[in-house]
Amino acid sequence: LSAEGSVCRPASMTFLASPMDIRVNPGLIARIAGYMNRYMVYAVAIHPVPLRYPGRGRLVYPGMVQLGNFMSLSLRSHIESHVQYTQDVYHGRFDDADKFRDFYDEYFSVLDCTAEFYLETLENVFIDQTLPKGLLTYEGKKVDCAAITDIPLFTVEGAKDNMVNEGQCQAAANFCVNLPDELKESYVQDGVG
């Protein structure tokens, strides 16, 4: 949009825990992506919606698979949280138990993702890293982050994030080579992941 001088350009850009460049401080997901391809992901993660549900037969990345993958990244802390919840209920600490329930009500609220969107995202972000390599296209044109010269950029990361490691979101600032430093801001929250 900046390259075209579009009136639809955003007033600012804010990225929250976004894997802008997984080659920066690579973690488990980046290592796995190094040997994955579209066909492997398709075989393992893409499933048809069961016949008894609306959308039957549509290919999706099931929310339950995503939830299992999320939980497996920090399984020990989830187990500890569930044990603590049981103890809180047993000992009558219902305020703490309610906080647990509120968190997991939201955490467990995952939806199926269309196969097309999921596969395209995996390919562009994790397998091919098209944005940091300057290969990402939109409507047939290469995305040119160097054209961004006056749109403030703000990145936010969690220091303990085990999915988007610290620095991967901040890397967005490196793509905007013509954006003045005073328009680039980053924040890392300690203890959050």
Regions from the language model: what does each represent?
Residues 7-8, 145-150, 176-181:
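Short, conserved loop/helix-junction motifs that constitute active-site signature segments
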Residues 162-171:
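Conserved alpha/beta-hydrolase "acid-adjacent" motif
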Residues 126-145:
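Active-site nucleophile elbow and catalytic-triad environment of alpha/beta-hydrolase enzymes
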Residues 2-116:
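Alpha/beta-hydrolase-fold enzymes
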Residues 97-103, 151-152, 189-190:
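Short acidic (Asp/Glu) and glycine-rich catalytic loops that position anionic groups and cofactors
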